[in-house]
Amino acid sequence: MLIIALAASGLICTPPQGTDQLLARSERVIVVGEIHGTAEAPHAIGEIACAASEKEPVVVALELEDTLQPTLDAFIAAPDAATAFATLAGSTLLNRAVQDGRTSEGLLKLLQRVRVLKASGRDITLHAFQPSSIGRGDSLDQAWYELNMGFALGQARQKRPDARVIALAGNIHAQKTPLARYPDIGLPAAGHLPTRETLSFKIAQQGGYSWSCGADECGVSPSNVRYDVDARGVIWSPAEDGGFDGVLALGPWTASPPISGED
């Protein structure tokens, strides 16, 4: 009966294989790099956060505009799903000019997951770390943007030094070393965090689909198979000259469309 009750309340955690070993590590910041617009990535973050929140405070950090922080705070403080959804009205979570996959139905489910965990008494919060204080005009390389994003992500750790930070970002921002093919990026956001405290994982490309943007439009796009399709879970295999500590294999992706205007 207890298991049934926990399942009904959303308190049973189903994290990827290897999460226990990951959370046993001393590093306080875990960054997961994704291709935006899949159902699997935000779901995995929610379940890892669920498992972590059983033992310690957790901050779920998301690549969303920092100006959305009051909206996110109101969302997870809402007493029920309908009230929570109403807090999104008028925000870029529902009205985004470019639907690049970050504000997906999968993200909405992650937000609801965090809200339910918080309502149950878990010490868990959300933190938006896409900087709005600097643009990427012709006069500034993206390296400046990455610097600001790294600082904004670091604030999740500095404001809650007792908490484990679990962050979801695009693959480029999540890498800890420079990308030779993109010299204007310099050191990506995760590379600006203290090395001793930071782990970074890249979600494996195992086929399937994502909702992402190409040169001309945004929509459902196929993903190439670049990793063993049968692999699952947290896999420690350093890549990109130390840019990632391993991969998170979640299987073939399912495209997750933008959040609709109806709950």
Please report, for each region that a protein language model flagged, where it lies by residue:
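Sec-dependent N-terminal signal peptides
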Residues: 1-9
